[in-house]
């Protein structure tokens, strides 16, 4: 089979013109295997097997056109979720189910989303969730062992990979990983305070090298609602609430307290809320604001804080959207 010739820059991708994220339809799996099933391919690798021809520029254009189309589409988002750990992904899952009409962008600094939810405590495999967080697992379709007051997922990666795959399947959700939030977009309110109106982003590798390279300006995403779930204080953790302190919107961080599972999980879920207009905070980032206890290797509060964050966002969405017209 002859290799393909050069393809014009404005030619269709894979034979179809690129549409918006809401219009793209899934291509049937058999198209990629030239109409063959796996059973037909099995044990016939020496009988004329070959991949369909491709030119390298087609790969480049297939990636870049789609990515920059997404950047254009989500430059004006309805909700931005900062941090794709267990809380952020749970938030995205609930919002994607409840409001398929909303454009939801997830910004994750790491190449690999999921945060610390790929393993349980001390790098062990199993994930423990206290009831009633088993309701979230049932909704996801993740199997577990029932131990009475808590349940155990055999491997944390089973939970995280299932949640991630379901989130990414929503046509109205886009994950921008390897991308960090460097600042918050603000608007002054009538009372002289501020409202959060979006995020300032950059490639994570650029963010990490501002000190040793010349000025590398960022990009922006406008949104009436930002939900921050960046976790414990750290290089990228608790970023949004630390920025609120530096902007004098909150006096200081409360500082996360020691481990108390019984106190911590209830507090994180119940206090998930809008901290300042336009910014909802959930998960362990919230413990840094409130001076709450850490809960250690139990993940139910992360999932249910995400559920509550989605509820809080929808309560104020219409009001914040009306305010975010400028």
Curated annotation (Swiss-Prot):
InterPro entries: FAD/NAD-bd_sf, Sti35, Thi4_fam
Compartments in which it is found: Cytoplasm; Nucleus
Post-translational modification: During the catalytic reaction, a sulfide is transferred from Cys-215 to a reaction intermediate, generating a dehydroalanine residue.
Key words of the record: Cytoplasm, Iron, Metal-binding, NAD, Nucleus, Thiamine biosynthesis, Transferase
Cofactor section: Fe cation
Keyword Metal-binding: yes
GO molecular function: cysteine-dependent adenosine diphosphate thiazole synthase activity; iron ion binding
Binding residue positions for substrate: 87, 108-109, 116, 181, 217, 232, 284, 294-296
Keyword Cytoplasm: yes
SUPFAM superfamilies from the UniProt entry: FAD/NAD(P)-binding domain (SSF51905)
Cofactor: binding details: Binds 1 Fe cation per subunit.
Catalyzed reactions per annotation: [ADP-thiazole synthase]-L-cysteine + glycine + NAD(+) = [ADP-thiazole synthase]-dehydroalanine + ADP-5-ethyl-4-methylthiazole-2-carboxylate + nicotinamide + 3 H2O + 2 H(+)
Main location class: cytoplasm
EC number: 2.4.2.60
Residue positions where 2,3-didehydroalanine (Cys) is found in the record: 215
Cysteines joined through disulfide linkages: none
GO BP terms, alphabetized: thiamine biosynthetic process; thiazole biosynthetic process
One term under GO cellular component: cytosol
Function: Involved in biosynthesis of the thiamine precursor thiazole. Catalyzes the conversion of NAD and glycine to adenosine diphosphate 5-(2-hydroxyethyl)-4-methylthiazole-2-carboxylic acid (ADT), an adenylated thiazole intermediate. The reaction includes an iron-dependent sulfide transfer from a conserved cysteine residue of the protein to a thiazole intermediate. The enzyme can only undergo a single turnover, which suggests it is a suicide enzyme. May have additional roles in adaptation to various stress conditions and in DNA damage tolerance.
Subunit structure: Homooctamer.
Family as reported in the entry's similarity comment: Belongs to the THI4 family.
HAMAP family for this protein: THI4
The protein, known as: Thiamine thiazole synthase
Species whose genome carries this gene: Sclerotinia sclerotiorum (strain ATCC 18683 / 1980 / Ss-1) (White mold)
